[in-house]
Every structure is written in structure tokens, then in C-alpha cells.
């Protein structure tokens, strides 16, 4: 976090925000750094929700691959974060479900990994300690796979061969040399829907959109809908394809 604030000072940034899915574990250290560096802190949070009627009729919202799934943000929350007792219980329940999914994906990853090299194995606790603060997410799993491959195979050719065997179906490794690109490739081949280590999320891992908005408002924040609009090929999701209907839907959700 020191580097983030150093860069902010160098670029004369007056306001700096922090954001993560479901959790606010970084708020305290972020707040202390903001005071130390005299930069105004903006506390934010992000949620993954589920709109069941949209899922049932196949309507994609702002996740282009999963009908009914909605990404939703809260901006400018109070510090300390206090969503209320019942909302905190619900948040903790969602986090537990999310981590159960991550553990199941690690189990599937380990099956793939040990089939290639029985001496290698991933651990949920190690991934959380090494790559995450509290909550393990898909990106942390991808990073763990990359780091595991790099530590075991110093030769790029052997490393690529190892990863290609994990991918299966005669797929090749194209993201080598760029950590972010390689981790995205690992996510696409192993962790996304259709991937060899994919585990579908339980509906209990999602909050209802009404609950999400209530948590944000109770925490002093502003409910915000992050608009996807289109992808690289210029295609819109069904939810966002008509601006008037999009405006109406967001207004009904008390957004804007």
C-alpha cells in the first residue's frame, strides 16, 4: 500500500479510493495511510448479486457470460464500515459460501496438478496467506497456479508444457512472459465456466439486489451500477441494450 500512496503523491492525486468484493478488511490501513499522506480517502465496496427473474428468462445484465448476475458498487461508504448487525450476518454467510466454492475449485485444481506432477499441490490457507488479505477469489487461484509453475519449472518450455497439460484438449500457452496475461489465460482455461476446475456458485453465494442496496445505504454509501455497455465486438447485453429501459430499471432500483 505504501507504493500506491507514493504514486498518488507523485501524481498530485487529491482523492484516492479503495474497493473490494464483499469485504472491507483493507479499510483501516488505507485510512491510516491517507492521514499520513494527506490524501482524502474514498471507501468503496463491490458486490456480485443475482436477479432471479432475469436469470430465468436468460437476460444478461452487466456480466456478459452469466444471465441474471449483476455487479453492483457502493461508493463513499462511512468509515468505520457498519452495515448493521443483520446485514453483517448476511455478508458473512455470503463470504462463507464464496470460500466454499474456492475450496472446491482448489480440490479440482489439485486433481489436475497431481495427475501431471504428484509432488505439487495447492493449499487454500497458503493461497490466502500469500496472495489475499482474507477472502480468496478466482484471481488468487490463477496467480497461485502461475507461481507454482514458475517455482517448479525454471525452464520456460517445461513450464509451458506443464500448464498446457493442465489446460487439456491440446491447448497451448500464449501468455508466458506477461504475468497478468498468463493469469487471465489460466482463468479462462481452468476457472471460468467450462474450465476444467470450474465449480458453479451456489445461489446462496449471491445477495439479492435489494439487500445489496440496503447494505450500501445503511453504510452511508451511494448505490452505483457499473455499466458494461458493450464488449470488444460492440455487442450489448439484453439489460443494457435499450437506454430508456435501462434508465427505468435503474430508477426502480433507486439508482440515479
Language model features with spans:
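An N-terminally biased module of ancient metal coordination in phosphate/nucleic-acid-related enzymes
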Residues: 1-69, 77, 185-220, 225-256
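Generic alpha-helix detector with strongest preference for long hydrophobic helices that associate
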Residues: 8-11, 15, 83-86, 90, ...
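Generic marker of "main functional regions" within proteins
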Residues: 23, 28-31, 49-51, 57, ...
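Short, charge-rich amphipathic segments
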Residues: 28-35, 136-148, 168-183, 204-214
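Short flexible/disordered coil segments
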Residues: 52, 105-106, 111-113, 179-189
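Non-catalytic, alpha-helical, charged scaffold/linker segments
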Residues: 80-165
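Long, low-complexity, polar/charged, intrinsically disordered or flexibly structured peripheral segments
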Residues: 154-198, 206
